[in-house]
């Protein structure tokens, strides 16, 4: 889950924008259709409130800063993202949270499922 700035439209979709390291930086990444590596993110609006949107995100690829860059690319940057949206008005960290995770157990193969409630600093901005 992520909280982004703005009222997300359309409410669901897939972002297919390749990513690469930003020229002159060892940290920042950017959308780069000429030289970037494939990056795919599926998103779905969960809730809009007070000029922010709570978004569920699912990655098909796992590029560095993928969620942060893809949401900024759509025009809805993560709040609290000091690198790509330096606005710390509502939260002092990236408003990004791993709410639900599933993967096979490495030995038994049994599906393991984990969930974690939205942290209080994020739920103070948008409640689930």
Regions found by a protein language model. Give the residues of each.
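RNA pseudouridine synthases
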Residues: 1-128
